[in-house]
């Protein structure tokens, strides 16, 4: 069976995007792993699947699969590419798009010059909603992981994030400590690990080790999580520029109970077909 797809990226965080509205598709874990292989497949960080809405009040349902085949709840860079994809493919003729994910609803707004603003929803600090094993919510936690002792902030942006402040992201042990923290026993669903360097009150540098993927050039939910942690700790202002290896995102958050807004690019690379 031939499947149409598009290759897209948000700041180098790359995706295979598939229309599951006009074509019937099913992807097993093994198939996703093969497609994700950068030597023998298409190559991507995540596969994004556009499905008909589960709720008639919404436009689409948004599913995300990591390169290891695992399904995850949210992907911010993917959300921007999702919005541009459905518009490019004529699946919708509006610039404001409402979708559901495994963890709730998000709204997408197409802007000019391939920019998309995403309402990422309200961040969750309650341990049970992250999920994270702790008796109560704290602004920082001290975690021990093998020979490391880590001070971090923990939050859910629809998926779990652990944010570690470092003096320099260039020297941060992203691959080693990221892999250890991803599977820390206090995160029952594993965790995305961000390494954040404070530049000033309106700018940070960030590298992210994504669960099920490893380090990526950009992570939208990771950028949101880092900004939210910095703002909640009183170190950052309400609007933050996040510099990632793949480029920059703008994150805005007014505080507890308020949604996080992320603005950044979504690029279409090519269209293709593949036999499944």
UniProtKB/Swiss-Prot annotation:
Site note Could be important to modulate the pK values of the two catalytic cysteine residues, residues: 161, 210
Entry protein name: Diaminopimelate epimerase
Involved pathway(s): Amino-acid biosynthesis; L-lysine biosynthesis via DAP pathway; DL-2,6-diaminopimelate from LL-2,6-diaminopimelate: step 1/1
Major localization class: cytoplasm
Source species, domain of life: Bacteria
UniProt cross-references to NCBIfam families, sorted A to Z: DapF (TIGR00652)
One protein family per Pfam: DAP_epimerase
One MF term in the entry's GO annotations: diaminopimelate epimerase activity
